[in-house]
C-alpha cells in the first residue's frame, strides 16, 4: 500500500509541473497568428524567400513573380503580356537592398535591379551571369553586391 502511495506522489510530482506549464503556455498571453486575407490572395503559394526592406515593406519572392506587401495591399512585379521583358524571369529566388534603396532581384535566369523611388526595373546584362540562376544576394557594409549562382 505504501508503495502505491509513493508511486502516486512520484507520478504526481513529475506530471504536475508539466501540466502547469502547458496551462500557462495556453493562457491569455499566448501568441496568436492570423493570416492576412490579402496574403492569401497571392497568385503563387510557392514562396522562395521573404525580405523586409528599410522602409518596412515585405517583399515576397515566388515562382510566379515578386510581390511587395505594404501591410494593406500587394503590388505585383512580373513579366506578362503587357510587360514581357520586365524581369529576366518570373521565378524569383531572392532580393536584397543596397545603400541607395535599390532592390536587387535574383531570378532563375539572371539579375535585375528595381529603383524603389522611380519604380524602374532594369536587367543586369553581363555575359557571365545572363541565363544563370541567382540564388542568393548579399549587400556588404561597404555596399558591394555579392551573389551566388547556380551551376
Regions found by a protein language model. Give the residues of each.
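Carboxylate-rich, polar loop motifs that coordinate divalent cations or form catalytic acidic clusters
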Residues: 1-151
Amino acid at each position: 500500500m505504501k508503495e502505491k502511495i509513493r508511486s502516486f506522489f512520484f507520478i504526481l510530482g513529475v506530471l504536475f509541473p508539466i501540466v502547469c506549464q502547458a496551462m500557462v503556455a495556453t493562457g491569455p498571453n499566448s501568441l496568436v497568428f492570423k493570416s492576412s486575407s490579402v496574403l492569401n490572395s497571392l497568385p503563387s503559394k510557392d514562396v522562395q524567400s521573404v525580405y523586409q526592406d528599410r522602409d518596412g515593406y515585405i517583399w515576397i519572392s515566388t515562382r510566379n513573380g515578386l510581390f511587395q506587401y505594404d501591410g494593406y495591399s500587394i503590388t505585383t512585379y512580373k513579366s506578362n503580356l503587357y510587360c514581357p521583358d520586365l524581369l529576366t524571369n518570373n521565378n524569383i529566388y531572392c532580393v536584397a537592398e543596397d545603400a541607395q534603396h535599390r532592390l536587387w532581384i535574383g531570378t532563375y535566369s539572371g539579375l535585375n535591379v528595381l529603383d524603389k523611388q522611380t519604380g524602374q526595373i532594369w536587367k543586369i546584362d553581363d555575359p557571365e551571369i545572363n541565363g544563370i540562376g541567382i540564388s542568393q544576394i548579399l549587400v556588404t557594409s561597404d555596399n558591394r553586391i555579392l551573389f551566388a549562382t547556380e551551376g
